[in-house]
């Protein structure tokens, strides 16, 4: 059985491809999906399944485009209210292709529709190989419980406790844990930089899995929650509907200085992606600097939101292309 993690450092986001006997599934794909198409072609896989562990809030997923380009079925928690054709996941549902067997667990708490995926290699069927936990269980942390507009953080934290203690922590200690995010993500507070773990290690080291009562857990998880970025709710709705294909986005053209000034004066944001030192030396008056290093797209979304017209400033066309792609990953397209 084939298993591969794809880690997008700039968003601290992990996605996965599982394959066997010519068929593959992709779990929690990033918006630009070429990486999965190329990997599938390299191994002779047909991508037949796209699985979302939940409606992501911190990035725009590629599930809709990947399904459109491959004919794959999209699997998503039944409570997501998705507005595109999909297979609704219920607790205990199973999917098998080749030697790869998937069992779905409904694990609400981070979001109401969250699911985890237990992966078993049928050539070694005595114990599951891994569990893909989405944003329910991280390495060293658990998902924040404040992303639902219909439920309180206390209600979600209680559900998260039940999902962890009644389902995920019942798995054998040797089962590998692969989450959807690592350190730097805004979906948790104390995530490790490690990209995988085991159920046993998390039981022993994860602060949120200390042997607390349900009441103590809820109090711990809801105390001093960091502010929820404003764009999170917008990304959830984009993912609920399915993002427009990146291939349909218009090409960018270079603008003369007078046009840049005119657009700025009309309300556009001039976003300077150069380093702070280069920006400090010379920049367009009124422009905002968010450098490409680090969490560029997340910071841009926090500072600017998703609905303003953006004029990009960068050293060269390659940097412009990078800046634009990274912005589209969080839903900034204008």
Model-predicted segments: where are they?
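Active-site neighborhood of phospho(di)ester-bond hydrolases with catalytic His/Asp-centered motifs
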Residues: 26-27, 47-56, 74-79, 106-109, ...
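Metallo-beta-lactamase
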Residues: 24, 101, 111-227
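Cytosolic catalytic domains that perform sulfur/thiol-centered chemistry
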Residues: 157, 170-172, 186-334
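Active-site-proximal cofactor/substrate-binding loop regions of enzyme domains
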Residues: 65, 74, 86-117, 138-139
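Divalent metal-coordination and catalytic microenvironments
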Residues: 18, 28, 54, 66, ...
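Conserved beta-strand hairpin/beta-sheet module of binuclear metal-dependent hydrolase folds
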Residues: 1-46, 117-119, 124-134, 140
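Active-site metal-binding loops of divalent metal-dependent hydrolases
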Residues: 29-30, 55, 79, 111, ...
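Active-site metal-binding motif and surrounding structural segment of the metallo-beta-lactamase
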Residues: 33-75
